[in-house]
Amino acid sequence: MKRRELILSAVAATGAGSGTNRVDALGLITPAPRYVPNAGTIYPFQARTDRIARLSVCTRPFRKQGPRIELEKIAGKNVVHNYGHGGSGWSLSWGSAMAVTSLVRTTNVREVAVVGCGALGLTAAVYMIRNGLKVKIYTRERAPDVRSFNASAGWTPASRVGTVEDCDPVRWEELCRNSFRMFQGLMGLPGDPLQWVDSYSLSDIPFDQAQAQRKADAAAAPVHFGTFDDRTKDLIPGNEDMAPGTHPFPTPYVQRTSQLIYNLPAYMSWLEHEFLINGGQIEYIDLQGPHDFGRIKETTIVNSTGYGARALMSDESIIPVRGQLGHLVPQHEISYALRYQNASLLPRHDELVVQRGTSDMDGYDNPSVAPDRAESEEVIQKLANIFARMTAPA
């Protein structure tokens, strides 16, 4: 028996790869699962546009200088700003919380207010309450209505976090490493709010050529986004080249690594529960301008309003970067991420996420939050083409 036949027979015997290609009502083919040595079974994505449960659009709060974490006197209050993290809000949330807490302690208070209940506000509140401070969150929205709930939810600490010319890489590295350390202490919690998954990158040309082209395009772009990942290469497993015949994908070049993802409904629920069970309070407020900080009784306030800070603070250093996600019905058997050209797939317990990403300039200075269904359908069709051409490993 040939090795190819032996693998498929073994998979069929266990039930992991049983079944044949299926054609759905829309005429799209879902191939049978494929077994990959040392990786388990690659279950195919049901790439169907009718599985879109919802679309979401979020405006990332990009600042050329990077996150604004600094103390300012406003309306008689000590206001510690904590916003402007671009596409790195979740990834840098714990490191930012530590930096914020250090500034809060310089004000010599025990009671602190946090404005905002998204990634940065909720995480800062949890960290401060764990460190002996009494914290109340003031917010207009809570999950699932905060912008942070619509993040793609992968570990992306350098995503549109600043420009090469203006962002401090040493400061970024400190935030990144502190966040990563905290995240590792949260692995294995009930419900898997955080988890590691295999991540596959597919390419039609050698990866070094693809990377050279991306660098050339980035250099020619009007905005030079910071690429600081080289400073923290030790945190994430490196890319592993997969030889032809060891994977089921149809492209000539495939790499595999590991990616940290956040299952946001479970993770945000855990953060809020952690905050409330330790004595935190949440109160509704709608602030229209900096003068409204005077309405808050606490004398030290952490301003974690994300993109909302652009209007609240009249801070035009915040530039919107539009990003759209397609949220699909979950496939719990899929436990890997995949990227091909400008299409990506990310697995979460609550859903599958698809996203278009041509370059860092995609969506730059675009404040529109109107969803474009055709954009997500295009991503699904591109992924459908990949999965329709899957083959069994040799």
For the regions a language model picked out, list residue spans one by one:
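N-terminal secretory signal peptides and thylakoid transit peptides that target proteins
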Residues: 1-14
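Active-site substrate-recognition segment that forms the wall
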Residues: 27-75, 84, 88-98, 118-133, ...
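Flavin (FAD/FMN) cofactor-binding and adjacent substrate-gating region
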Residues: 7-9, 49, 55-76, 148-150, ...
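Glycine-rich active-site loop/strand segments that organize a redox cofactor
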Residues: 141-175, 231-238, 244-246
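Short beta-strand to alpha-helix junction loop
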Residues: 88-92, 167-178, 255-270, 370-374
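A conserved short coil-to-beta-strand element within the FAD-binding core of flavoproteins
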Residues: 281-295
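Beta1/beta-strand and adjacent pyrophosphate-binding region of the FAD-binding site
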Residues: 110-118
